[in-house]
Amino acid sequence: MGKNIFFEQKGPFFLGELFTALQFKKKIKIFDIRNLQQATNRDLTFFDHINYISLAKSTKAAYCITTARLKDYLPKTCVPILVKNVIFELCRVTRQFYPNADIDSPDLTLKNSKKIKISKVKFGNNVLIGKKSKIGKNSIIGSNTIIEHDVIIGDNCTIGSQVVLRNSLIGNNVVIQDGCKIGLKGFGFIPL
């Protein structure tokens, strides 16, 4: 996974800024929060379930949010940050790096598809497309559909009518039925 194209990132942060209740010997800068597999020695990661032991053992992360029960699976190069609830702390820290990621703001860059030149794509009526969106060849987009900024749709896709696509990377040969909303905020929760 490369750079996050959907959300503005803040940081870097000192580790002590992210975990104010903990004491750290050094002033270490953390540049991003990533999963176990993609984290680098400049990143923070998280490890919350034994299903990810193999990934934990090979992570390149500098620090890892985890529990006392799982810490021994991390490599010596990764310092465990012990917490009671990994998912809660992950959400709290992620919000510092990506403070607007949980807000569904309207896309003010939308333009009518008739004003945008995309070859080999068929559009229904009243289709709106955001800035830097890409639609693959031989795709069909139904009427009254909104494709927000930075969304990428592959080749040979059929997107139904009254669909909203946000924060999404859609592969090739995908069919999305009428009325679907993909990439919008759902009914998430943080277990306490």
Give, region by region, the residue ranges found by the protein language model.
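Terminal amphipathic alpha-helical/low-complexity segments used for targeting or macromolecular assembly
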Residues: M1-K114, N173, G179-C180, L184-L192
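Structural signal for interior beta-strand "rungs" in well-ordered beta-sheet cores
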Residues: F46, L110-L192
